[in-house]
Amino acid sequence: MLNVIATGLSLKARGKRRRQRWVDDGRVLALGESRRSSAISVADVVASLTRDVADFPVPGVEFKDLTPLFADRRGLAAVTEALADRASGADLVAGVDARGFLVAAAVATRLEVGVLAVRKGGKLPRPVLSEEYYREYGAATLEILAEGIEVAGRRVVIIDDVLATGGTIGATRRLLERGGANVAGAAVVVELAGLSGRAALAPLPVHSLSRL
């Protein structure tokens, strides 16, 4: 029994050393590189693995596709580590449908807390709490379960992939607060600074890994 426990601790320590070998204080180390040599920032990693798609999902909108970032093991790990640092102290992470689920689940696992799925309208069984909002290309609805998950009194951090106008995170905040949660802040991978989402969400603390 003692040997099993010791082995588990050893594996956990080795895993931590592997993460620290290339993620150090918000910097991402190249393979085989030491902390004494140069490193690139998480923001640079995000920018290098983000694909710009013109006129999607509607004409006139430039879509920030983070699929290559999430598919890259180093990129995903660096983003997870950085977002987890900004969400420290939360006892529940709220991930926004759909790409927010990817990072929210990873961050929740890193923090050893639960994750709440904030779904698009019509995806959850009733009863639900619903909130309509407007984004840069139309109206939408977000929902959370009204029963079965207790959020009242819990310190929640909202996690999403992109902050644009602030409509999505604002609606998520209202939903959580209607359920009695203490929304401590929001953390996103990419912030589109020109769309003033941060100002729209004030005074909610907002953390972004990259501002484009």
Swiss-Prot record:
One of its GO terms (molecular function) is adenine binding. It comes from Mycobacterium tuberculosis (strain CDC 1551 / Oshkosh). One of its GO terms (cellular component) is cytoplasm. It is an enzyme of class 2 (transferase). Belongs to the purine/pyrimidine phosphoribosyltransferase family. It is found in: Cytoplasm. The gene is apt. This is Adenine phosphoribosyltransferase. Catalyzes a salvage reaction resulting in the formation of AMP, that is energically less costly than de novo synthesis. Pathway: Purine metabolism; AMP biosynthesis via salvage pathway; AMP from adenine: step 1/1. Homodimer. PANTHER family: ADENINE PHOSPHORIBOSYLTRANSFERASE (PTHR32315:SF3). GO terms for biological process: adenine salvage; AMP salvage; purine ribonucleoside salvage. Its main location: cytoplasm. It comes from the Bacteria. Keywords: Cytoplasm, Glycosyltransferase, Purine salvage, Transferase. It catalyses: AMP + diphosphate = 5-phospho-alpha-D-ribose 1-diphosphate + adenine. The keyword Cytoplasm applies. Transmembrane segments: none annotated.
